[in-house]
From Swiss-Prot:
Keyword Transferase belongs to the record: no
Keywords, comma-separated and alphabetical: Antiport, Cell inner membrane, Cell membrane, Ion transport, Membrane, Sodium, Sodium transport, Transmembrane, Transmembrane helix, Transport
Biological role stated in the UniProt entry: Na(+)/H(+) antiporter that extrudes sodium in exchange for external protons.
Annotated compartments: Cell inner membrane
Catalytic reactions on record: Na(+)(in) + 2 H(+)(out) = Na(+)(out) + 2 H(+)(in)
Gene Ontology BP terms: regulation of pH
InterPro entries found in the cross-reference section: Na/H_antiporter_dom_sf (IPR023171), NhaA (IPR004670)
GO molecular function: sodium:proton antiporter activity
UniProt-recorded name of the protein: Na(+)/H(+) antiporter NhaA
Gene Ontology CC: plasma membrane
Length: 400
């Protein structure tokens, strides 16, 4: 049975997928219509602030990718901590299958991408693009099917997505960091100690965490490590429970920010990153090794990796198929993990530093693979549910 909190999470994530789709479509219309010049100028408006000798100035698109997405990763960190302490990740037995699937869903897509691009060192930087899963879109498709999809499969997908996001965070920290600044690292370390002190003293004032979180974000941004990691680090120091009080600061902040993430941050990210120009894109661009690596990595690599690794784990007795599901419905869910969209676009921006070297075919490939995975995953899950209904009806008739 799903808890009320889990049901609310599913509904918000699924409805948020509609906003994501709308934002992406609007961006495509802007980029390929008469508003393309305005759209591109808007994305590159310089914004920033100065404090004494300190100056922080970036184009709007980088404020979104480095700033707003840090808030997204902050909420992701809160969800992860809550799940580890009292949620789905608390029970090791429930984590085995999603963890195995997440590993397969990273290894196989990355291998497929590398096969196509190992001869070009710059192109090969995008190996992590097809390893991500967009939870909002995948859950959106599942919610359309409603009760046809067992709750156990929804829990499996969410748990896999959480583990997948943790791996994405580690990948960004290890492989997509720039030139490192020891001074900025030192400042970040001091701030982290401050956050640790707040946690140990069980301070429940949001403003204290906010101030230190902003300082941490700036120091991490200047350190050469991607600034979004500051969000995850800050989240881990937010107390789940407060002494002498029934309220949870972590849950309170998560509740306050979740709507902004779902209906503002992610749609804005989609709007500024999904505006792909279709001018000059033809068969040559779509058959480029990067495009093939992304499309085949997301569409084939994710489903083969997740399903294949889970199949082996189940057959060896390390895990069990989710309750009330069959191999067909489980396979349909594995196909949905090929919906990369937001996270894949985000890793794409880190891989190629927002250049248009591949004429946006790399971004278009993410959209193509995500759409194919979404449509086919829906069809397979629907077929599995119809087949299950027929078997149940036949069993009822035979009982009479």
């Amino acid at each position: 049975m799903c808890s009320e909190n889990f049901k609310k999470f599913l509904v918000s994530e699924a409805s948020g997928g509609i906003f994501l789709i709308a934002a992406a479509v609007i961006a495509m219309v802007f980029q390929n219509g008469f508003l393309s010049e305005f759209y591109n100028s808007f994305l590159h408006i310089d914004m920033g602030f100065k404090f004494g000798e300190f100056l922080l100035q970036k184009p709007l698109i980088l404020w979104v990718n480095d700033g707003l997405m840090a808030i997204f990763f902050f909420v992701l960190g809160l969800e992860l901590k809550r799940e580890i302490l009292e949620g789905e990740l608390r029970n090791p037995a429930q984590v085995v299958l999603p963890a195995v699937g997440a590993i397969g869903g990273i290894v196989v897509p990355a291998f497929i991408f590398y096969l196509f691009n190992h001869t070009d060192s710059f192109a090969a930087r995008g190996w992590a693009i097809p390893t991500a899963t967009d939870t909002a879109f995948a859950l959106g498709i599942i919610m359309i099917l409603g009760a046809r999809v067992p709750a156990s499969l929804k829990i499996f997908l969410v748990t896999l997505a959480i583990i997948d996001d943790v791996c994405a965070i580690l990948i960004m920290a290890i492989f997509y960091s720039g030139d490192l600044s020891l001074i900025s690292f030192g400042v970040a370390a001091i701030v982290i100690l401050g956050l640790l002190a707040l946690n140990l003293l069980n301070v429940n004032k949001k403003s204290f965490y906010l101030i230190l979180g902003i300082i941490l974000w700036i120091s991490v941004l200047k350190s050469g490590v991607h600034a979004t990691l500051a969000g995850v680090i800050s989240a881990f120091f937010i107390p789940l429970k407060c002494k002498n009080s029934d309220k949870s600061l972590l849950k309170e902040i998560e509740h306050d920010l979740h709507g902004y993430i779902t209906y503002f941050v992610l749609p804005v990210f989609a709007f500024v990153n999904a505006g792909i120009s279709l001018k000059g894109i033809g068969l040559e661009q779509l058959t480029h090794p990067v495009s093939l690596g992304v499309i085949l990595g997301l569409f084939l690599g994710k489903q083969i990796g997740v399903f294949g690794f889970c199949f082996v784990a189940i057959k060896l007795g390390f895990a069990k198929l989710p309750k009330y599901s069959c191999w067909i419905s489980f396979y349909g869910l594995c196909i949905l993990t090929g919906i990369g969209f937001t996270m894949s676009l985000f890793i794409n921006s880190l891989s190629y530093n927002d250049t248009d070297k591949f004429a946006y075919a790399d971004k278009l490939s993410v959209l193509i693979a995500s759409v194919i995975s979404g449509v086919l995953g829906y069809i397979v899950l629907y077929i599995a549910s119809v087949r299950k209904e027929k078997i149940e009806v036949k069993a009822q008739n035979e009982s009479f």
